[in-house]
């Protein structure tokens, strides 16, 4: 059974992704630090043979490295993030730690991981907030980033780390 890590799997999008992956017969390792955005109810009654929950902040690089070594995932979906715009204005430090430092740690661990697991993938999830206030139509991935909150700026920063 192929193993997939989902970071931020207790969030709204992450929990739906976990359900979909389990339906497709993957073994899912859900890494989540458990915060105001986490909801265990979204993942109740999951089959234990296909699912493992690990409470962990992706800012903890050493433990993250150990998990990648132990499970050797074929894919990592990074949905871990502080996501509340208003909270980012009141206290941007947590957003910088989680969205920038946490993503950097995950990238560093993944870089080490792919030395021995060449076919592994990392899929980083962003937000439309990086494009700022879109007045007409939809944003395209090729549009310029114009973040208008600390949340959007930290997500834009993490996107640039992934792109580089």
Tell what function each PLM region has:
Residues 1-164:
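N-terminal Rossmann-like NAD(P)+-binding domain of SDR-like oxidoreductases, especially those catalyzing
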């Amino acid at each position: 059974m192929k193993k997939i890590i989902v970071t931020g799997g207790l969030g709204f999008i992450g929990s739906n992704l976990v359900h979909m992956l389990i339906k497709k017969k993957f073994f899912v390792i859900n890494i989540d630090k458990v915060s105001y955005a986490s909801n265990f109810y979204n993942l109740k009654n999951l089959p234990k043979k296909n699912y493992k929950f690990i409470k962990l902040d992706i800012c903890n690089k050493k433990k993250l490295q150990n998990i990648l070594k132990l499970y050797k995932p074929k894919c990592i979906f990074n949905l871990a993030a502080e996501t509340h715009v208003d909270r980012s204005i009141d206290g941007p430090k947590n957003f910088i730690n989680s969205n920038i430092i946490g993503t950097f740690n995950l990238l560093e661990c993944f870089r080490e991981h792919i030395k021995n697991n060449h076919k592994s993938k990392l899929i980083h999830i962003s937000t439309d907030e990086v494009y700022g206030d879109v007045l007409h139509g939809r944003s395209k991935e090729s549009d310029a980033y114009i973040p208008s909150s600390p949340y959007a700026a930290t997500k834009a920063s993490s996107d640039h780390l992934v792109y580089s």
